[in-house]
From Swiss-Prot:
Highest taxon of the lineage: Bacteria
Family: Belongs to the methyltransferase superfamily. UbiG/COQ3 family.
Enzyme class label: transferase
Gene: ubiG
InterPro entries for the chain: SAM-dependent_MTases_sf, UbiG_MeTrfase
Function text: O-methyltransferase that catalyzes the 2 O-methylation steps in the ubiquinone biosynthetic pathway.
Keyword Methyltransferase: yes
Keyword S-adenosyl-L-methionine: yes
BP term (GO), one: methylation
Species annotation: Marinobacter nauticus (strain ATCC 700491 / DSM 11845 / VT8)
Pfam families in alphabetical order: Methyltransf_23 (PF13489)
Catalytic reactions of this protein: a 3-demethylubiquinol + S-adenosyl-L-methionine = a ubiquinol + S-adenosyl-L-homocysteine + H(+); a 3-(all-trans-polyprenyl)benzene-1,2-diol + S-adenosyl-L-methionine = a 2-methoxy-6-(all-trans-polyprenyl)phenol + S-adenosyl-L-homocysteine + H(+)
Name of the molecule in the record: Ubiquinone biosynthesis O-methyltransferase
């Protein structure tokens, strides 16, 4: 495990909470709240129906199931055994078919049955939890078909994100369990763009995601100071 791009402490955080993944009133409420926004953002740009999609860091399967319900053929990967068990069980209960696997993206990229075979790769709310995000992005890019699309989301690294994403979300509003995030692991959009370009992808769009603590509503917009999504594309001919 030492040579894998995995932080066991990060995995342990989500293992401990896994049984509550599909409870929209639990610690995962923020994920439930933003999932429709993320899903629509992706579907509007690639039209998921009939596409082959890979969800990297799928956790309990919220996004994976959502993409499958939009008609995509989805593979979801994660290194957390408990979240994957929850994802598989929920899929059986809901009748939504997703191929879940316990593996890292770097390992899957070495499998010729998967490398270069996906129209869409998503890596949402995951990159701030791994030791080497650039390695993840390179491996994700290698999974794309020519002309394929990649979507990433994470948290910006600046004083405002420390105030909002850690102090506010974890200690004041109690939206997330304390210790969910480490500020030093947050990734600036400029850094994310560099990672994507070095992986051979063209950045197409940067979009912010904000939370209003009064209305308790998330929305997409231009403010990328805290949470943001980025859309990139493989530049090879389809």
């Amino acid at each position: 495990m030492n040579n894998q791009n995995v932080d066991q402490n990060e995995i342990a955080k989500f293992e401990a909470l896994a049984s509550r993944w599909w409870d929209p009133t639990s610690e995962f409420k923020p994920l439930h709240d933003i999932n429709p926004l993320r899903l629509n953002y992706i579907d509007e740009r690639v039209s998921l129906a009939g596409k082959r999609a890979l969800d990297v860091g799928c956790g309990g399967g919220l996004l994976s199931e959502g993409m499958a319900l939009r008609g995509a053929h989805v593979t979801g990967i994660d290194m957390g055994e408990a979240p994957l068990s929850v994802a598989k069980l929920h899929g059986l209960e809901s009748g939504v078919k997703v191929d879940y696997r316990q593996t890292t993206i770097e390992e899957l990229a070495r499998d010729p049955e998967h490398a270069g075979q996906y129209d869409v790769v998503t890596c949402l709310e995951m990159l701030e939890h791994v030791p080497d995000p650039a390695s993840v992005i390179r491996a994700c890019a290698s999974m794309l078909k020519p002309g394929g699309h990649m979507f990433v989301s994470t948290i910006n690294r600046n004083p405002k994100s420390f105030l909002f994403a850690i102090v506010g979300a974890e200690y004041v509003l109690n939206l997330l369990p304390k210790g969910t995030h480490e500020w030093k692991k947050f990734i600036r959009p400029s850094e994310m763009s560099d990672h994507l370009r070095h992986a051979g992808l063209e950045v197409r769009e940067l979009t912010g995601m904000t939370y209003n603590p009064i209305t308790k509503v998330y929305k997409l917009g231009r403010d990328v100071d805290v949470n943001y999504l980025m859309h990139a594309r493989d530049t090879r001919e389809d």
